[in-house]
From Swiss-Prot:
Keywords: Disulfide bond, Knottin, Secreted, Signal, Toxin
Covalent S-S links between cysteines: C44-C59, C51-C68, C58-C86, C70-C84
The protein's name: U1-lycotoxin-Ls1e
Keyword set includes Disulfide bond: yes
Domain of life: Eukaryota
Propeptide segments, given as residue ranges: 21-41
Leader sequence segment: 1-20
MF terms in GO: toxin activity
Family to which the UniProt record says this protein belongs: Belongs to the neurotoxin 19 (CSTX) family. 04 (U1-Lctx) subfamily.
InterPro entries registered for this protein in UniProt: Spider_toxin_CSTX_knottin, Spider_toxin_CSTX_Knottin_CS
Compartment(s): Secreted
UniProt GO cellular component terms: extracellular region
PROSITE patterns xref list: SPIDER_CSTX (PS60029)
């Protein structure tokens, strides 16, 4: 039974990894606009750091590239601004948890 769970976890991880790469390819047009504005950076943005000005500059985690996650913040003046940070999406967290659990069990 545990072998089946580990195989399923590995399949979920591989599918999530390939889908994250596919999503990155779909966002290529946004990347081209960033390159046109010469905002490319050689250094990546670490996890939990702000990525508002460079939404494609997040570093790579253990298994997946961090994604720039944005929220709308309302200031005391009532102005709405968008704030973004590099983080791990929930489905990537679940896949990493399953792989980590499998590594602890099977060495």
């Amino acid at each position: 039974m545990m072998k089946v769970l580990v195989v399923v976890a590995l399949l979920v991880t591989l599918i999530s990894y390939s889908s994250s790469e596919g999503i990155d390819d779909l966002e290529a047009d946004e990347l081209l606009s960033l390159m046109a504005n010469e905002q490319t950076r050689k250094e990546c943005i670490p996890k939990h750091h702000e990525c508002t000005s460079n939404k494609h500059g997040c570093c790579r985690g253990n298994f997946f590239k961090y994604k720039c996650q944005c929220t709308t913040v309302v200031t005391q003046d009532g102005e709405q601004t968008e704030r973004c940070f590099c983080g791990t999406p929930p489905h990537h967290k679940a896949a990493e948890l399953m792989v980590g659990f499998g590594k602890k069990i099977f060495g």
